[in-house]
């Protein structure tokens, strides 16, 4: 802050790629329906964070923020807000990673894929909700209201159904006759069919094709001139036989009442009580047996229609079997398809995990490239040394185990030999001493290894304590923001103090003026009473006016001094600005010369053999 309370301008460098990404983010948010991003008075942080919060809320996820009345928040509020947003993203299964400092630092390159995914998810959720609300509205409308066409259709449908049921009831088959109990049983199938049809009032005669031919009729040829007469005669004979046959059947029947022949409710209940599968099986078996019996008893009556019915029945049976097989295959196909979907889902999860690992690897490589090479090399040497020591320890332990097993075998063998020769005590003491020495040596090596591990851990902590370039840049940005806020607050406070002092001085002068006017008003009548008092009053007024003039001259002099001081400070400020411009220009030229020097050095190195 300068002596005049003004905030110095800090040079900021806007990255072109960041600006492009910010423009793309704002275009995405406006296209998705977040029109608050068009307001020019808002900061990029408020636009981006507001758009992210709007997308998250649109996707039916809760986030504890309030952006309606807290624009241009402080750093603490921004940090809390970004942490809440980042904590919600994993719940939404966002495939992109984002940190709070990236949002707060306006890293639009990393924010853009998250915004893109959120906008896509918000549009999909809005479409789903639109379809759901539309279908719900239609269903509610259909429950409460109906169109004239629907009402007319319902009326016509009820009328048509009622007419159809009445027609079916009127024209349904009714049993008019019934065979008597003592009548003879019909043996052939054709007679049974005719008898059943006659019970329902239907009379059918034998056709010409259904009449069985006699062997003698097939052998004797008929002359061409007598063909017509023979056919007429045969038809008359058939008709007469049919009439006799019907009369014979009708003599065995008796007329039925309207309610006879109907099944009672108990009989229907007993029939329905049977299992449907058993009924179907019994019906199919009965049909097969009946067809076999009829084929065996009277093969001459099997015509083309009956053979066609048998083929149709067999084909229907095959169709049923194939349908069952098709259902089984469809179930297997659905199971395979579900397995394929699960495999694809696992594949996408694995690929996303692999991409995350690759991104983490790239971040680690960037951090490694920005770190100090000497410290990294030292750390690599220590890690390699640690690994070599661990390997040596493992090898030494394995050797010690082998040696211990070998020595144990020697001890056992020596014990066995010592029992024979009487030298067990001396050899056991020697082995004990050797074992203690090896044990002490192993303990020393372990202590050295622990010391090295502690040193490596201390170095790890020291390296972790050193901030990276990105963290330093973040700290610098935060300090600049804090400095700007402190300077703005200081400037505002200084203005308040100056205003207070000015108003206080004005108040003092106004009080003096009021007191003077009151005293003049109080003493004016007495002073005008006598000439001597009037002269004294006038002299006092002249003295007061002279004092006011002197005070005014002092204030004018002080004003001129402050004005001169201001002009002097302004000149110094302009000189400092000129020096600053010259400094930035010199730094820029120096960087350009350094770059040219580096290019020339690389060219010279490339030309030298």
UniProtKB/Swiss-Prot annotation:
**What domain of life is recorded for the organism?**
Eukaryota
| Major location category of this protein | other
One Pfam family this sequence matches: CCDC93_N
Cited InterPro entries: CCDC93 (IPR039116), CCDC93_CC (IPR019159), CCDC93_N (IPR048747)
Q: Which GO terms describe its cellular component?
A: early endosome
Q: Which UniProt keywords apply?
A: Coiled coil, Endosome, Protein transport, Transport
Look up keyword Coiled coil and say if it applies. yes
Coiled-coil intervals: 229-459, 510-579
Q: Where in the cell is it found?
A: Early endosome
Q: Does the keyword DNA repair apply?
A: no
- What biological-process GO terms show up in the record? Golgi to plasma membrane transport; protein transport
Q: What does this protein do?
A: May be involved in copper-dependent atp7a trafficking between the trans-Golgi network and vesicles in the cell periphery.
Q: Which family does it belong to?
A: Belongs to the CCDC93 family.
Protein name listed in UniProt: Coiled-coil domain-containing protein 93
Q: Which gene encodes it?
A: ccdc93
């Amino acid at each position: 802050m300068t002596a005049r309370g003004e905030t110095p301008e800090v040079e900021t460098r806007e990255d072109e790629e960041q600006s492009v990404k910010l423009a793309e983010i704002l275009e995405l948010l406006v296209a998705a329906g977040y029109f608050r991003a068009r307001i020019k008075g808002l900061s990029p942080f408020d636009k981006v964070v507001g758009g992210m919060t709007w997308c998250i809320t649109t996707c039916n996820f809760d986030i504890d923020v309030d952006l309606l009345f807290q624009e241009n928040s402080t750093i603490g509020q921004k940090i809390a807000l970004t942490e809440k947003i980042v904590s919600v993203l994993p719940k939404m299964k966002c495939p992109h990673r984002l940190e709070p400092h990236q949002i707060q630092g306006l890293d639009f390159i990393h924010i853009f894929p998250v915004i893109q995914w959120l906008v896509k998810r918000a549009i999909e959720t809005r479409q789903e909700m639109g379809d759901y609300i539309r279908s719900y509205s239609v269903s509610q409308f259909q429950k409460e209201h109906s169109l004239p066409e629907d009402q007319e259709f319902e009326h016509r449908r009820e009328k048509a159904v009622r007419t159809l049921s009445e027609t079916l009831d009127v024209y349904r088959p009714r049993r008019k006759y019934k065979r008597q109990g003592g009548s003879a049983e019909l043996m052939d199938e054709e007679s049974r069919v005719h008898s059943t049809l006659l019970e329902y009032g239907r009379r059918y005669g034998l056709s010409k094709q259904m009449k069985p031919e006699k062997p003698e009729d097939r052998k004797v040829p008929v002359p061409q001139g007598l063909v017509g007469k023979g056919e007429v005669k045969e038809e008359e004979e058939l008709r007469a036989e049919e009439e006799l046959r019907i009369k014979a059947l009708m003599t065995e029947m008796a007329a039925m009442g309207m309610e006879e022949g109907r099944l009672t409710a108990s009989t229907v209940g007993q029939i329905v009580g049977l299992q449907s599968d058993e009924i179907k099986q019994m019906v199919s078996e009965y049909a097969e047996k009946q067809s076999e019996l009829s084929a065996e008893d009277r093969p001459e009556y099997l015509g083309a229609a009956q053979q066609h019915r048998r083929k149709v029945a067999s084909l229907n049976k095959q169709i049923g079997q194939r349908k069952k097989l098709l259902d089984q295959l469809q179930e297997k196909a659905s199971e395979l398809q579900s397995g394929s979907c699960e495999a694809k889902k696992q594949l996408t999860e694995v690929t996303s995990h692999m991409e995350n690992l690759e991104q983490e690897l790239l971040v680690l490589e960037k951090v490694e490239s920005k770190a100090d090479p000497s410290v990294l090399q030292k750390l690599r040497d220590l890690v390699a040394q640690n690994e070599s020591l661990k390997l040596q320890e493992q090898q030494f332990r394995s050797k010690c185990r082998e040696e211990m097993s070998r020595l144990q075998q020697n001890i056992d063998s020596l014990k066995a030999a010592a029992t024979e020769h009487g030298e067990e005590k001396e050899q056991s003491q020697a082995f004990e001493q050797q074992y203690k020495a090896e044990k002490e040596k192993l303990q020393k090596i372990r202590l050295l290894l622990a010391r090295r591990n502690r040193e490596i851990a201390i170095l790890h902590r020291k390296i972790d304590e050193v901030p990276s370039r990105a963290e330093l840049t973040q700290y610098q940005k935060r300090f600049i923001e804090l400095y700007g806020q402190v300077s703005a607050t200081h400037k505002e406070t200084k203005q308040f103090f100056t205003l207070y002092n000015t108003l206080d001085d004005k108040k003092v002068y106004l009080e003096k003026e009021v007191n003077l006017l009151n005293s003049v008003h109080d003493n004016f009548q007495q002073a005008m009473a006598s000439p001597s008092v009037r002269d004294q009053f006038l002299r006092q007024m002249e003295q007061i006016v002279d004092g006011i003039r002197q005070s005014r001259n002092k204030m004018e002099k002080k004003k001129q001094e402050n004005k001169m001081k201001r002009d002097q400070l302004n000149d110094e400020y302009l000189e400092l600005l000129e020096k600053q411009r010259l400094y930035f220009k010199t730094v820029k030229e120096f960087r350009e010369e350094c770059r040219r020097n580096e290019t020339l050095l690389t060219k010279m190195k490339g030309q030298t053999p």
